[in-house]
């Protein structure tokens, strides 16, 4: 026979558990679930960085190493890619506001970005270097050769190229041009002497335009890696992004894309 005392204790315990359960917050869907429910992966891209992520104005389509990665990433989720335009100047604000799920367009991993946003493990090793006219290649052998008032250095606004120039070339004549993809052509035409860029981009533009040279390509000023940028706070999403990149590195996909777009 069950005693009244046992019934009371059991009832009290059940009521207590029910009360606790009622106070516990309902688990919210994370980014991973949101994307799969939506059916699209929102990808932020500046669309101005050959060979990483470049908007081909003739076809209206994005091209490059990071574009291929984004497409494969979306495929792993069973969704399609929708590109969201951003700029180097607004990249941080756009990422922090959740304008897109990831940003992947040749984004340098930096401490400043890591403090405000989540960033994937690094991929592809590169460094800051210069692009100049082939006729001027012998003039620029070191950073000191750039840091002169007579040298017109052109950069795009808001990114690490501008930050590098401001920090390391205080005596140069710094020119800021809004469209990164237009700067190599302006250098070739003599509108500026040097573009601060990265080894990946410099290699591509010297291949595409015989008027250009990258004399310091094998001895860059810095050593960096790219990363995928995300709004801070969703550890499950960050884990999935890192897992995907590790898998694609392990199975040779990243090496194949590097051979196709960079080497």
Where are these regions (language model features)?
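A ligand-binding cleft/hinge motif common to bilobed small-molecule-binding domains
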Residues: 90, 107-116, 163-167, 186-189, ...
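Short helix-initiation/N-cap motifs at beta->coil->alpha
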Residues: 67, 82-93, 138, 175-189, ...
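Short loop->beta-strand "edge-of-pocket" segments that line small-molecule binding or catalytic clefts
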Residues: 39-45, 63, 143-158, 174
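Periplasmic-binding protein-like
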Residues: 125-129, 199, 203-246, 263
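Extended ligand-binding regions for polar small-molecule ligands
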Residues: 68-76, 134-136, 144, 150, ...
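Ligand-binding cleft/hinge of the Venus flytrap
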Residues: 53-59, 70-79, 142-149, 161-177, ...
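Extracytoplasmic small-molecule ligand-binding "clamshell" domains
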Residues: 29-106
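Acidic, polar ligand-binding/catalytic clefts
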Residues: 71, 75, 80-145, 213-214, ...
């Amino acid at each position: 026979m069950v005693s009244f005392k046992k019934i009371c204790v059991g009832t009290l315990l059940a009521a207590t558990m029910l009360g606790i359960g009622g106070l516990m917050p309902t688990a919210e869907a994370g980014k991973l679930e949101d994307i799969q429910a939506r059916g699209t992966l929102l990808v932020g891209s500046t669309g101005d960085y050959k060979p990483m992520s470049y908007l081909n104005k003739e076809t209206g389509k994005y091209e490059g190493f990071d574009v291929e990665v984004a497409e494969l990433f979306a495929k792993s989720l069973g969704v399609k890619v929708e590109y969201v335009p951003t700029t180097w100047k607004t990249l941080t604000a756009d990422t922090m506001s959740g304008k897109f799920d990831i940003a992947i367009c040749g984004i340098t991993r930096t401490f400043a970005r890591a403090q405000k946003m989540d960033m994937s493990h690094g991929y592809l090793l590169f460094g800051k270097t210069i692009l100049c006219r082939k006729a001027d290649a012998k003039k620029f052998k070191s950073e000191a050769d750039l840091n002169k008032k007579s040298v017109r250095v052109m950069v795009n606004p808001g990114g690490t190229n501008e930050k590098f120039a401001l920090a390391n070339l205080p005596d140069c004549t710094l020119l800021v041009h809004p469209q990164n993809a237009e700067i190599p052509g302006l250098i070739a035409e003599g509108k500026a002497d040097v573009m601060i860029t990265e080894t990946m981009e410099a290699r591509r533009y010297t291949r595409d335009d015989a008027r250009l040279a990258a004399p310091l390509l094998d001895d860059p000023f810095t050593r960096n890696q790219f990363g995928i940028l995300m709004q801070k706070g969703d550890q499950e999403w960050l884990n999935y992004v890192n897992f995907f990149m590790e898998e694609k590195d392990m199975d040779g996909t990243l090496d194949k894309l590097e051979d196709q777009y960079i080497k």
